[in-house]
Amino acid sequence: MKKFRWVILIIVALVCLLLWAQVFNIMCDQDVQFFNGICAINKFIPW
């Protein structure tokens, strides 16, 4: 049962990461000033 809980946690974490990646991509496309620094870092991370 504990192993099953870990699998769910990992899946949820991965989904959250994917959603964050999508949000960053949208923000970067719109060239939001606040996200410029994050976008520069984001380009080096292969999503």
UniProtKB/Swiss-Prot annotation:
Keywords in alphabetical order: Cell inner membrane, Cell membrane, Membrane, Transmembrane, Transmembrane helix
Main location: membrane
Transmembrane regions listed in the UniProt entry: 6-26
Gene Ontology cellular component annotations, sorted alphabetically: plasma membrane
Cell compartment(s), UniProt: Cell inner membrane
Family: Belongs to the MgrB family.
Name of the protein this chain belongs to: PhoP/PhoQ regulator MgrB
Gene name of the record: mgrB
